[in-house]
A protein has these predicted regions:
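Active-site-proximal loop/turn and secondary-structure-junction residues that shape catalytic pockets
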Residues: 46, 72, 106, 142, ...
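Phosphate-handling active-site elements
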Residues: 160-162, 188-202
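Short pre-catalytic strand/loop immediately N-terminal to key active-site residues, enriched for Gly-Thr
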Residues: 161-175
Length: 224
């Protein structure tokens, strides 16, 4: 379901166009009438109008479990969600999430917690769960050249929690990391796997894609 389109290249996003509410709602309708959809994920929900139409039209009966990838801010600082829409996102989208997968910066924005320590990241995950997300993955940052691993914190619906750790790869080829991670989780849930298996497989696949980069573009290229 197309909610927005962007113009950009490896240097960054230059502009975006949000789809009309009626067009988004129509896509929900026609897809649910024809396909047996086993899982879904969100992407860029740019403003109040888009958030409302997605929340009004999504249902687990027609679209399966929902992976919420809160596309709020890119790794390079570009804002993709209007500031005025943060509270509505918390109220209407997060409670729909079977899994929510914010990156380090998005989790800071959604929770107001700095997360300078592991304990604060755990606190932020519980905060998001308190907002209604069943399972939470807070992805680690990739901006410290001294780091040796990238550590994601996972908090499951049953209270179980663990860290997913992979070696840090110093590279500018990271575009699509979060999109791919959430898409793989959705695909694994669609196959009937549980959340723990889904997030672990997603972490493994994204690490392999980062560790074997493609030389595409002149700046911040995509993962493989």
């Amino acid at each position: 379901i197309l909610t927005a389109a962007v113009s950009g290249n490896s240097y960054g996003i230059t502009s975006s166009q949000v789809m009309p509410q009626e067009f988004i709602a129509e896509q929900f309708k026609v897809l649910s009438e024809d396909f047996d959809i086993k899982a879904a994920k969100t992407g860029m929900l740019a403003n109040d109008d888009v958030i409302n139409v997605v929340a009004d039209n999504y249902s687990p009966e027609h679209f399966g479990p929902l992976v919420v990838d809160p596309v709020i801010i890119t790794k390079h600082g570009a804002m993709l969600l209007e500031q005025s829409a943060y509270e509505l996102f918390r109220e209407r989208i997060i409670p729909l999430a079977t899994v929510i997968t914010p990156n380090f910066y998005e989790a800071q924005k959604l929770t107001g917690i700095e997360m300078t320590t592991d304990e604060e990241r755990v606190k932020a995950a519980h905060y998001l769960q308190d907002l209604g997300a069943k399972n939470v993955v807070i992805k680690g940052a990739h901006n410290d050249d001294s780091q040796t691993t990238v550590d994601d914190f996972v908090l499951l619906e049953d209270g179980d929690s663990f860290w997913l750790k992979k070696p840090f790869v110093k590279t500018d080829r990271l575009n699509g990391t979060g999109d791919s991670f959430s898409a793989i989780i959705a695909a694994e849930l669609a196959k009937g796997n549980n959340v723990k298996i889904a997030v672990t497989k997603a972490k493994d696949a994204v690490y392999a894609a980062i560790a074997n980069p493609l030389t595409v573009g002149h700046k911040f290229g995509p993962i493989n």
